[in-house]
From Swiss-Prot:
Its cofactor is Fe(2+). Its EC number is 2.3.1.234. Substrate binds at I137, V138, S139, G140, G141, D170, G183, D187, N276. This is tRNA N6-adenosine threonylcarbamoyltransferase. HAMAP family: TsaD (MF_01445). It is found in: Cytoplasm. It is an enzyme of class 2 (transferase). SUPFAM superfamilies: Actin-like ATPase domain. Keywords: Acyltransferase, Cytoplasm, Iron, Metal-binding, Transferase, tRNA processing. Fe cation binds at H115, H119, D304. The lineage of its organism: Bacteria, Bacillati, Bacillota, Bacilli, Bacillales. Belongs to the KAE1 / TsaD family. It comes from Staphylococcus haemolyticus (strain JCSC1435). It holds the Pfam family TsaD.
């Protein structure tokens, strides 16, 4: 293996077109991200067909910009990595087909990467992962607790039984007429409100690491409906604070309990909701109180980007795991499928 391993990574699982060049799994030479937020804002959420069209329009120039920014050519690249899933199938296929074309044209290995594994390895771009550890995954489509005993070993110990946390944020945001994307808007308002409303904290069975947010979401919607029926004032800041406190309490408490139960002193957080200031602050407090080392990526690495895909791909490359040119996208994939068996 070369002393320096350069991986060109492509991420198109949802509404960001991103291409990155990663050196040795932890050094970002370039990380270009084209966001589609403005295009989807008027619809109040991501429209799959619109997302796919934007990926088609932007993928070629994004690849070129990533190579130019890294000051390298395709001949310098050791492997091509791409998100295989989970995600929007149409969006995924744009990135996968681009990656397959490059792999064929330049005779490079093709590495399929699980999107959530990428989110986890965003942490590795800023601080080396040490094992064992617990990962709290919080995003629009996933809420999970994962135990890792080594690189690319994923054991799910808890997951949502209904809504993902990011999905709950977006639905509550729409209920109080906040613009898309709703999660950051609630987080911003929550800094100025009061914990006025007694929204439920759903703990489920004793010692369970699973999550449930549908009841909380329904409670918020019903409360707002009742207030409006009575022509009472709805203080958006108070709704945001009360809702966020409920979510953060459950996420942080279960994450800390998992660390204690599995006897690990390292907690990492992954996914778009990891940029939430309320969650970051609460986890920092609890980890300090319990002597647990906490790692959360910078906000720019919490949201979808190709650098995280390149970071995870490095360990597949080291293990000799590649895909054939008939690689297809998968809209649903369990994170445990991404485990490298040693």
């Amino acid at each position: 293996m070369n002393k320096e391993t350069l991986i060109l990574a492509i991420e198109t699982s949802c509404d960001e077109t991103s291409v990155s060049v990663i050196k040795n799994g932890n050094s970002i030479l370039s990380n270009i991200v084209l966001s589609q937020i403005e295009s989807h804002k008027r619809f109040g959420g991501v429209v799959p067909e619109v997302a796919s069209r934007h990926h088609v329009e932007g993928i070629t120039t994004t690849i070129e910009e990533a190579l130019t920014t890294a000051n390298i050519s395709m001949n310098d690249i050791d492997a091509i990595a791409v998100t295989q899933g989970p995600g929007l199938i149409g969006a995924l296929l744009i990135g996968i087909n681009a990656a397959k074309a490059l792999a064929f044209a330049y005779d490079k290995p093709l590495i399929p990467v699980h999107h959530i594994a990428g989110h986890i390895y965003a942490n590795h771009l800023e601080e080396p992962l040490t094992f064992p550890l617990i990962t709290l995954i919080v995003s629009g489509g996933h809420t999970e607790l994962v135990y890792m005993k080594s690189h690319m070993h994923f054991e799910v110990i808890g997951e949502t039984r209904d809504d993902a946390v990011g999905e709950a944020y977006d639905k509550v945001a729409r209920t109080i007429d906040l613009p898309y994307p709703g999660g950051p808007q609630i987080d911003k308002l929550a800094q100025y409100g009061k914990d006025t409303y007694d929204f439920p904290r759903v703990w489920l069975e004793k010692e369970s690491y699973d999550f449930s947010f549908s009841g909380l979401k329904s409670s918020v919607i019903n409360k707002l409906h009742n207030l409006r029926q009575k022509n009472e004032e709805v203080v958006k800041e108070d709704v945001a604070t009360s809702f966020q406190n409920s979510v953060v309490d459950v996420l942080s408490t279960k994450a800390i309990n998992a660390c204690k139960a599995y006897k690990v002193n390292r907690l990492i957080v992954a996914g778009g909701v990891a940029s939430n200031k309320g969650l970051r602050y609460r986890l920092q407090q609890l980890c300090e109180d319990n002597n647990i080392h906490l790692s959360i990526p910078s906000p720019k690495l919490c949201t979808d980007n190709a650098a995280m895909i390149g970071a995870a791909a490095y360990y597949y490359y080291q293990s000799g795991i590649t895909a054939k040119l008939d690689l297809n996208g998968e809209n649903n994939m369990d994170i445990e499928e991404a485990t490298i068996e040693v």
